[in-house]
C-alpha cells in the first residue's frame, strides 16, 4: 500500500471516529428559590430554572463537557451516577475524593466520555442536598446492535425494529420522595430530637405530585400483611401520615447514651397530615408509533423511599437495570431502591384511555402512595380506566401479582442476568474486604466499617485523588480501602450484628467507578476464612454463573434481628478514588460511606492542569 493510500485511510478513519464521538457541551446553572412541586411551598434547587433537572441525552462515546455554575449560597457538586468515568476520575463529582466542592459564585467543568450506554442519572453529592431537588435523567444511546435483546421479547421483525426505535426515544420518569423541609432542616430534626426521623409528604414523578391524607384507619389497613406482627409491638399504629411512631425501639435501635426529645419534632413531621391538591405527571403515549411499543426509563431519585412501579392493566418487560442490559422478563410490578434505574418496554395493546401509574413507597418506613397517568394519545375522556395491580400502599390486589413481580432482595427472586452474558471469575478473588454495616452511638449514626463514621466534609480540602496517602497513620484510614489494579475484589457486607443495631432496615448500596456482581447472599454471621470456603459450605447461597451486575444493591430487611450477609465481586480496571455508600440520604449523612482507592499501584498521574488544585 502506498504512503498516500495509508494516509488517506488514516484520515477516513479519523473522520468516522470523530463523526461518531462528537463533543457535546452542556451548561447547568444551579439556583435556590421557592417552589411547590406538591402544592405546598418550600425552598428547593432549580437547574436551568426547572425542577427536576433537565434530561441529558448523548450518544455512546460522545465527549461531554458540562459547565456547572453554582448560583446558590451553599456548596454543590454534581455526580454522574452510573457513568464509569474511565480515565476521568476527576469528573466523578464526589467532594473530598475527586474534587473540592463548588463554592457559591464559582463554576466547575466536568469532562468525560459518555459511557456506558443506557439509562443513568445525575444528582448533587454535597451533604444531604439530594433532598433539595438537584437530580435529572441521563440517556446514553448505544452504538451496538440490540437485536438479540429484543428478540427475547418478540420474534417479529417489525416488533424488533419498533422496540429499537422506542428504546432510542423513551419516556422518562424521574421518581423522587419529597418533604416539606429542606435537607438542613430535616437533618436538624433528627439531631435535635435524638431520633432518626424519616417521615415524608409526597412521592413525585417528574417533579409533580400531591399530598394525600386518606385517614389513619385507611393507612393502618394498608400496612403490608404481617408487618406489625413480625416487626413491631402488638397494637402498633401508624399516624395519619402513614408513619410509625418515632420512638419505637425497633425503629431507633439502641439503647444509646443520648437524650431522646420527641417533643422537639415539629408539628406535621410525623403526624398532622395537611392535604394539597396539585397535579400529577401525565405521560402521553401513541399506540400508532413503533408498532405499539413504548420504552420508559425510570430513575429512582428517592432519598429514603423504596418504590414499586406498576401501570394499570399493562404488563411490562424489564430489560435494563442500572444502565446494564438484562435478559428481559415480563412483570406487572417491580420494586426499586433509591439510586436505581430501570428501563421497561410496554406494549400499548389496551383500550385507549387513561391508565394510572402506581408508584407507592413499598418499604417498611411509611405507607405512602404516589401516582402518575399514562394516557393514550387521542383519548378525550377524563375518566380513568384499567385494572390496578397495587393498592395505595403497594400491596398486591390479586394473587397473580406476587407471581409476576420483581423483588430484588434475594438471589432466588432476582434472576435478572446480564445481556450479553457477563460473569465474574469463579473461585476466590484476589482480595476480600469484610464491611460490617449498622448504627453506632446514636440512631442517626451509621457506619460501613464497624465503628468509623464517614464525615460529610471528609477530605474536602485535600481530595484523595490528589492526596491518596492523606489518611495514612490516622484514624480516618479506617474510612479507606485500597485495591490493586488488575485484581478481583470481593466486598462482603454484614448487617444486623452491631450492638444496638440488630434490628436493621435495608441499605441501598452504591459503588462509584464500577459495577459489581452480587455472587452471594445468606443468613447468619460471616465467619468464613474466605469466600471460596463459604461457597463450598453453602453452595445454594451463591451464584457465579448468572449473577446480576449493577452499581446499586439492596441489603436485607432484618427488623426481626436475624443477621444477613451479601458478597459483591468486581474487577479493578479503573484506578481512582470511588465512594461506596448507602444511597439513603439520612444514612450517608450519618456516616455510611467508605472511600475505595481502586488501583493504588496504577494511580492517575497525569491529571489535566485545569483540574490541578491551587
Swiss-Prot record:
This is Laccase 1. The keyword Oxidoreductase applies. Cu cation 1 binds at residues 79, 510. Its cofactor is Cu cation. Binds 4 Cu cations per monomer. Cu cation 2 binds at residues 81, 123, 583. Belongs to the multicopper oxidase family. Cu cation 3 binds at residues 125, 512, 581. PANTHER family: LACCASE-RELATED, MULTI-COPPER OXIDASE. Pathway: Pigment biosynthesis. Laccase; part of the Pks1 gene cluster that mediates the biosynthesis of an anthraquinone derivative pigment that contributes to conidial pigmentation that provides protection from UV radiation, heat and cold stress. The polyketide synthase Pks1 produces 1-acetyl-2,4,6,8-tetrahydroxy-9,10-anthraquinone though condensation of acetyl-CoA with malonyl-CoA. The dehydratase EthD and the laccase Mlac1 further convert the anthraquinone derivative into the final conidial pigment. It comes from the Eukaryota. InterPro entries: Cu-oxidase-like_N, Cu-oxidase_2nd, Cu-oxidase_C, Cu-oxidase_fam, Cu_oxidase_CS, Cu_oxidase_Cu_BS, Cupredoxin. It comes from Metarhizium majus (strain ARSEF 297). One of its GO terms (molecular function) is oxidoreductase activity.
Amino acid at each position: 500500500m502506498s504512503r498516500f493510500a495509508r494516509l488517506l485511510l488514516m484520515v477516513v478513519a479519523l473522520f468516522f471516529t470523530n463523526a461518531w464521538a462528537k463533543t457535546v457541551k452542556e451548561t447547568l446553572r444551579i439556583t435556590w428559590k421557592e417552589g411547590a412541586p406538591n402544592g405546598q411551598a418550600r425552598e428547593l434547587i432549580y437547574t436551568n430554572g426547572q425542577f427536576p433537572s433537565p434530561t441529558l441525552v448523548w450518544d455512546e462515546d460522545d465527549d461531554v463537557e458540562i459547565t456547572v455554575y453554582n448560583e446558590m449560597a451553599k456548596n454543590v457538586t454534581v455526580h454522574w451516577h452510573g457513568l464509569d468515568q474511565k480515565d476521568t476520575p476527576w469528573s466523578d463529582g464526589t467532594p473530598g475524593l475527586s474534587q473540592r466542592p463548588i463554592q457559591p459564585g464559582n463554576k466547575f467543568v466536568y469532562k468525560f466520555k459518555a459511557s456506558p450506554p443506557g439509562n443513568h442519572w445525575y444528582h448533587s453529592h454535597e451533604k444531604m442536598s439530594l433532598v433539595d431537588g438537584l437530580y435529572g435523567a441521563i440517556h446514553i444511546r448505544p452504538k451496538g446492535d440490540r437485536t438479540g435483546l429484543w428478540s427475547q421479547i418478540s420474534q417479529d421483525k417489525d416488533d424488533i425494529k419498533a422496540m429499537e426505535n422506542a428504546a432510542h426515544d423513551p419516556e422518562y420518569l424521574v421518581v423522587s420522595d419529597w418533604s416539606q423541609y429542606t435537607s438542613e432542616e430535616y437533618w436538624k430534626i433528627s439531631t435535635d430530637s435524638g431520633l432518626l426521623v424519616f417521615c415524608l409528604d409526597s412521592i413525585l414523578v417528574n417533579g409533580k405530585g400531591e399530598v394525600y391524607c386518606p385517614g389513619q384507619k385507611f393507612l393502618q389497613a394498608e400496612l403490608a400483611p404481617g408487618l406489625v406482627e413480625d416487626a413491631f409491638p402488638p397494637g402498633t399504629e401508624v399516624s395519619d401520615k402513614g408513619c410509625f411512631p418515632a420512638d419505637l425501639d425497633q425503629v431507633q435501635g439502641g439503647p444509646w447514651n443520648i437524650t431522646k426529645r420527641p417533643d422537639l419534632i415539629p408539628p406535621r413531621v410525623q403526624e398532622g397530615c395537611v392535604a394539597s391538591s396539585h397535579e400529577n405527571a401525565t405521560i402521553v403515549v401513541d399506540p400508532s408509533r413503533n408498532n405499539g411499543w413504548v420504552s420508559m426509563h425510570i430513575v429512582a431519585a428517592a432519598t429514603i423511599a423504596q418504590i414499586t412501579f406498576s401501570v394499570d392493566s399493562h404488563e411490562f418487560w424489564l430489560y435494563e437495570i442500572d444502565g446494564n442490559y438484562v435478559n428481559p422478563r415480563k412483570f406487572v410490578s417491580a420494586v426499586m431502591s433509591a439510586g436505581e434505574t430501570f428501563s421497561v418496554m410496554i406494549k400499548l395493546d389496551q383500550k385507549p384511555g387513561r391508565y394510572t401509574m402506581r408508584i407507592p413507597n413499598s418499604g417498611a418506613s411509611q405507607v405512602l402512595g404516589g401516582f402518575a397517568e399514562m394516557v393514550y394519545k387521542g383519548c378525550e375522556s377524563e375518566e380513568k380506566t384499567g385494572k390496578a395491580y397495587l393498592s395505595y400502599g403497594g400491596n398486591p390486589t390479586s394473587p397473580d401479582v406476587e407471581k409476576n413481580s420483581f423483588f430484588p432482595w434475594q438471589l432466588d427472586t432476582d434472576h435478572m442476568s446480564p445481556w450479553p452474558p457477563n460473569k465474574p471469575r469463579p473461585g476466590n478473588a484476589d482480595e476480600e474486604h469484610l464491611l460490617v454495616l449498622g448504627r453506632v452511638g446514636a440512631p442517626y449514626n451509621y457506619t460501613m466499617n464497624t465503628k468509623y463514621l464517614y464525615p460529610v466534609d471528609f477530605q474536602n480540602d485535600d481530595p484523595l485523588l490528589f492526596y491518596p496517602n492523606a489518611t495514612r497513620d490516622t484514624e480516618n484510614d479506617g474510612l479507606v480501602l485500597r485495591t490493586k489494579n488488575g485484581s478481583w475484589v470481593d466486598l462482603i457486607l454484614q448487617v444486623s450484628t452491631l450492638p444496638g443495631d440488630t434490628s436493621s432496615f435495608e441499605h441501598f448500596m452504591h459503588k462509584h467507578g464500577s459495577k459489581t456482581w452480587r455472587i452471594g447472599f445468606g443468613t447468619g454471621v460471616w465467619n468464613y476464612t474466605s469466600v471460596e470456603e463459604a461457597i463450598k459450605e453453602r453452595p445454594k447461597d451463591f451464584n457465579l454463573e448468572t449473577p446480576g451486575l449493577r452499581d446499586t444493591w439492596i441489603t436485607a430487611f432484618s427488623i426481626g434481628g436475624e443477621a444477613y450477609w451479601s458478597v459483591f465481586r468486581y474487577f479493578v480496571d479503573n484506578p481512582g478514588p470511588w465512594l461506596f455508600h448507602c444511597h439513603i440520604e439520612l444514612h450517608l449523612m450519618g456516616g455510611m460511606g467508605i472511600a475505595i482507592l481502586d488501583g493504588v499501584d496504577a494511580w492517575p498521574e497525569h491529571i489535566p492542569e485545569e483540574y490541578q488544585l491551587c
